[in-house]
């Protein structure tokens, strides 16, 4: 029985060590709210990303509504016929 209790104690000690190591990394990964310079830098970075991606945004034609005329956007009559539900295939 001495071997069983030693194994149990060793297992409990390893679990406690793993818990302490996990909690220490969790605390170390927490951002510092008192550092105003890093917050300001993060806000500037996000603003730069927003302006960069706003220039590349494209409207999504034909995804949501049928109000756009397909002939305007380069679809010929055959493509329009294939989209028509009354067209016989």
Swiss-Prot record:
Cellular component, GO annotation: extracellular region
Positions carrying Phenylalanine amide: 61
Protein name: Neuropeptide F
Membrane-spanning ranges: none
Maturation-removed propeptide residues: 65-89
Bridged cysteine pairs (disulfide): none
Role noted for this protein: An integral part of the sensory system that mediates food signaling, providing the neural basis for the regulation of food response; coordinates larval foraging and social behavior changes during development. May have a hormonal role in females.
Keywords assigned by UniProt, alphabetized: Amidation, Cleavage on pair of basic residues, Digestion, Hormone, Neuropeptide, Secreted, Signal
Subcellular location: Secreted
Signal sequence bounds: 1-29
Keyword Signal tagged: yes
Top-level division of the source organism's lineage: Eukaryota
Protein family: Belongs to the NPY family.
GO molecular function: neuropeptide hormone activity
Any GO BP: larval foraging behavior
Gene, per the UniProt record: npf
């Amino acid at each position: 029985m001495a071997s069983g209790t030693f194994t149990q104690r060793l297992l409990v000690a390893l679990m406690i060590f793993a818990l302490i190591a996990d909690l220490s990394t969790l605390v170390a990964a927490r951002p510092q709210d008192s550092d105003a310079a890093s917050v300001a830098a993060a806000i500037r970075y996000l603003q730069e990303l927003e302006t960069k991606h706003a220039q590349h945004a494209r409207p999504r034609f034909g995804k949501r509504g049928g109000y756009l005329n397909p002939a305007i956007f380069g679809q010929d009559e055959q493509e329009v016929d294939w989209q028509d539900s009354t067209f016989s295939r």
